[in-house]
Each structure stands twice: as C-alpha cells, then as structure tokens.
From Swiss-Prot:
Gene3D superfamilies: 3.30.70.330. One of its GO terms (molecular function) is rRNA binding. Belongs to the universal ribosomal protein uL23 family. One of its GO terms (cellular component) is ribonucleoprotein complex. The gene is rplW. Keywords: Ribonucleoprotein, Ribosomal protein, RNA-binding, rRNA-binding. One of the early assembly proteins it binds 23S rRNA. One of the proteins that surrounds the polypeptide exit tunnel on the outside of the ribosome. Forms the main docking site for trigger factor binding to the ribosome. This is Large ribosomal subunit protein uL23.
Length: 98
C-alpha cells in the first residue's frame, strides 16, 4: 500500500488530557477511517511516523444525540485507534511549535 493511502487511513490524532497522560505510557490515540483494521493501522503508523508499533486497540465510538433548533440529530460514528509503541519510540505532535 502506498503512503498516500496511509495518510487517508489516519484521520487525526486525539489530543486531550486523557490521551496526554496515556502518552507517558507510550500509547497514542488517533481517529481512523471507519473501515480500518488493526494490521493496516499498524502499518500506517509505522510508515508515517517511522516508529515501531507494539500493539493496536480499536474502538467504535457511537455518535451522541444532539438537539439543534428543536430537531434531534446525531453526530457521526467514529473509530478510534489506541496505538502502543515499543519502549524506545515516541511520537512528538507538538514538535516545532514555538
């Protein structure tokens, strides 16, 4: 699989207080494509960030129900991947920010 398809597979990193504490344990969270599988997520992270992945956990996050001007709708369903890296590897999302 070429690298441009890997960039389509990984939507965006999840940067919250909870995922920041997970990053201390070498775990990073990403929103991924809804058809993504563990093996393809592992290959994509290794190709994009040049790191060694130890384990991948995938969760389906159901969209919340919201009300807008009296009309009830739902947010989109998402798929979240929590990637565990090997000991000597890490991903720096904030690198270069001054």
């Amino acid at each position: 699989m070429s690298s441009y398809k890997y960039y389509d597979l990984i939507r965006k990193p999840i940067i919250t207080e909870k995922t920041t504490t997970l990053s201390e344990q070498n775990k990073y969270a990403f929103y991924v494509d809804k058809f993504a599988e563990k093996l393809t997520v592992k290959k994509a992270i290794e190709e994009i960030f040049k790191v060694k992945v130890k384990k991948v956990n995938i969760l389906n996050v159901k969209g919340k129900k919201k009300r807008f001007k009296g009309i009830i709708g739902t947010q989109i369903n998402r798929k979240k991947a929590i990637v565990t890296l090997e000991k000597d590897h890490n991903i720096d999302f904030a690198g270069g920010i001054k």
